[in-house]
Amino acid sequence: MGSFKSSVFILVLHLLEGALSNSLIHLNNNGYEGIVIAIDPNVPEDETLIQQIKDMVTQASPYLFEATEKRFYFKNVAILVPENWKTKPEYERPKLETYKNADVLVAEPNPPGNDQPYTEQMGKCGEKGERIYFTPDFLAGKRLDEYGPQGRVFVHEWAHLRWGLFNEYNDDQKFYLSNKEIKPVKCSADIAGKNVVNHCQGGSCATKPCRRDRVTGLYAQECEFIPDEQQTEKASIMFSQSIDSVVEFCTEENHNREAPNMQNQRCNLRSTWEVIRDSEDFKKTTPMTAQPPQPTFSLLQIGQRIVCLVLDKSGSMAIGDRLKRLTQAGKLFLLQTVEQGSWVGMVTFDSAAYVQSALRQIKGGTDRDALTKSLPTVASGGTSICSGLRSAFTVIRKKYKTDGSEIVLLTDGEDNTISSCFNEVKQSGAIIHTVALGPSAAAELEELSKMTGGLQTYASDQAQNNGLIDAFGALSSGNGAVSQHSIQLVSRGSTLQNSQWMNGTVIVDSTVGNDTLFLITWTSQPPQILLWDPSGKKQDGFVVDTNTKMAYLQVPGTAKVGTWTYSLQASSQTLTLTVTSRASSATLPPVTVTSKVNKDTGKFPSPVVVYAKIHQGGLPILRATVTALIESVDGKTVTLELLDNGAGADATKDDGIYSRYFTAYNTNGRYSIKVWALGGVNAARQMGISQQNGAMYRAGRMKNGEIIWNPPRPKINIDDLLSKQVPFSRTSSGGSFVASNVPNAPIPDLFPPCQITDLKAKIQGDSLINLTWTAPGDDYDHGRADRYIIRISTNILDLRDKFNDSLQVNTTDLIPKEATSEEVFVFKPENIAFENGTDLFIAIQAVDEVDLESEISNIAQVSLFLPPQTPPETPSPSLPCPDSNITSAIPGIHILKVMWKWLGELQLSVALG
């Protein structure tokens, strides 16, 4: 399975706090404040879009208020206007609001024409989502027929984002069998409608009833459930908010637990209202007695980036070449990472602070070089972090307000006075990114990142892991076009002996290549450096800085697409290689990797979930090899293979988000996380995919008793997607979390197998049941479980609530496979009536070798459907005599009703006028 394996490639996580979310949303007396809606820089300037956003939120607020029994409404919203739009007096500079922490992103569809609203969800049921996505055409009302009013859709997506709800429809399986009946996947079950198919042939289409498959007993995939125009049922918003009568979430009383949808699968059959009721929002509010006010809006426009480096030069920075490594990382940031046009200042500190450079705008190489000369070269003195921060505020205020500015704070020392400036930090409106260097950095350091929405990173003293350079490489702007951001392609290090070589390759794909930099560092003597481009041409021109112990090559123009080859030779020292680049075009989105953990504190024995999102614009990158390297404060590392398989820690298969549980704690303290991503080489292929967490696309709607069909919904075809993917490698930088409550070795086994979330069941033959699922491990999704317990019941709630009392299946011959493997098990139900029309529910529990049990799996369902026997053929020398009568409803018109006796497939219809 490769869960724990060594890798020389490392990709640092770009840590966007998650549950740990960087979101600024907070609840204040029933009203949601701090909502950030960002307009993507690639959206053409259109002032009406701002009004459309306001209209959507204004419509959504009372709908949300009534749907939550007068408990929640939208109080204020900040709209981020792109920097490349015209400035206006009413546009203010943001404070902590950035594109990185935006809750809603308005962007052009990718691929074109796919305007489905959706929410990115990485976590479990009840865990907050990441971000809502809308397109300009959707906000302009051009998709009303497909999705319904924009305000209602916003509430549907808000429920994904804020409360971790899932959809109550299912595009992959629209119908299911229950008690011999075919039922649509819907909630509530009382929503009325018709099961029909839009049959098109020869350029014309006709609405026809769905036909039952004689083998499966279900309707064909093209069959659709079209809700009636007039409804009385009020639930549920997570099924179809577009139905006029739907104004509520499903409750325990009207929730359809049998429907095979994501809400039932991910939330253990709980209704959406039950999940909302368990949320922190619900627990700390009571219903309002008056109507809420309308939302208020602030318009914020991104301006030039303002950054001040605040760098520790205390005596402890002389340990283990820390100051030299800081200079190397600082040079990468100043020469490459920080964007053109940015303003950069620098402060150093020990027990006092020293201004090394006032704010200086990056206009070209001269400015970058000048700033590198201000980096510290001597370490001495104590540690006063607040002195450094206060000095940085002063540097910034000499030219700009501190609102929305950024401070990069690096320290390796302890400082028990850091909390004395917390209030000043909060009032400043500045975003603080923290870099903890070594094992003794101030324990409260990360609080500065948390309170301001900055990145928190940790770099150990293990130079070969390149952690400090990766941390500074992560500090690209949280705003602006992604085409301007620095992207790490490779980050690698190695300790060499006896004239050994460090050999390898770097893939420069077609989405990057501008401003490409090769950076090499060493700890003793300059190594021999050999580099060839994809055509085999040797590259010269490395700038060698022996004082800083680094060399770098800036590739002119756009680097050649293909595989670059390098060889580095040295003896008895550590080398590192970092390669960065920028997008090759402003119109072609680059492949990007961002990542996060689900918590900033890992409290043993609770696992930490590591996520990596790999996308090109709005399209997911599939079948990539993604590896996370997790380094503890004592230098030990664990390697995880992250997976996009929809099992274990991974919420959704094939969404470009790769996930895995981390359980291998070995000590308390900080852990850094690094990930390597390699893709586009051995990609598999399968059918088309659609957004899993989006509003339902209406196939059609009833109007005046007639069905009006919408165009078929656009789908992402994985075949097309993979054919366009090219080989690539990526690194992205800088995340950490803090572990606590880790016992001394030997660490006891307190981790159970993870929950099975992808159990599927189907009938095999006349009476066998075929089960498939992804194997959990001994410790969550690592190792191998000891055994499985499978139980069945004809009552779905009994199986959920009384699992141990339900009938157990004989699994003597079922031996668990290694975690992440596919399991298949076929059995014949015994000691239970299993006949035509029987609905049977199945669930699994995994148990490890010390008898720790997983949570009960999702519940799978099978319905035994025995096709009716085909009647024997009988000779029919002549047509039978039908039963007939004639009715006259309108003078002059007679309708002959003909009732034929059984003639197999013969159907006749006669109309006379």
Curated annotation (Swiss-Prot):
Glycosylated. Belongs to the CLCR family. One of its GO terms (cellular component) is plasma membrane. Residues 46-199 are annotated as: Metalloprotease domain. SUPFAM superfamilies: vWA-like (SSF53300). May be involved in mediating calcium-activated chloride conductance. May play critical roles in goblet cell metaplasia, mucus hypersecretion, cystic fibrosis and AHR. May be involved in the regulation of mucus production and/or secretion by goblet cells. Involved in the regulation of tissue inflammation in the innate immune response. May play a role as a tumor suppressor. Induces MUC5AC. This is Calcium-activated chloride channel regulator 1. Keywords: Autocatalytic cleavage, Calcium, Calcium transport, Chloride, Glycoprotein, Hydrolase, Ion transport, Metal-binding, Metalloprotease, Protease, Secreted, Signal, Transport, Zinc. PROSITE patterns: VWFA (PS50234). Its main location: secreted. Residues 1-21 form the signal peptide. Induction: Strongly up-regulated in bronchioles with recurrent airway obstruction (RAO). The keyword Secreted applies. It is an enzyme of class 3 (hydrolase). InterPro entries: CLCA_chordata, CLCA_N, CLCR, Ig-like_fold, VWF_A, vWFA_dom_sf. GO terms for molecular function: intracellularly calcium-gated chloride channel activity; metal ion binding; metallopeptidase activity. The gene is CLCA1. Zn(2+) binds at residues 156, 160, 167. It is found in: Secreted, Extracellular space.
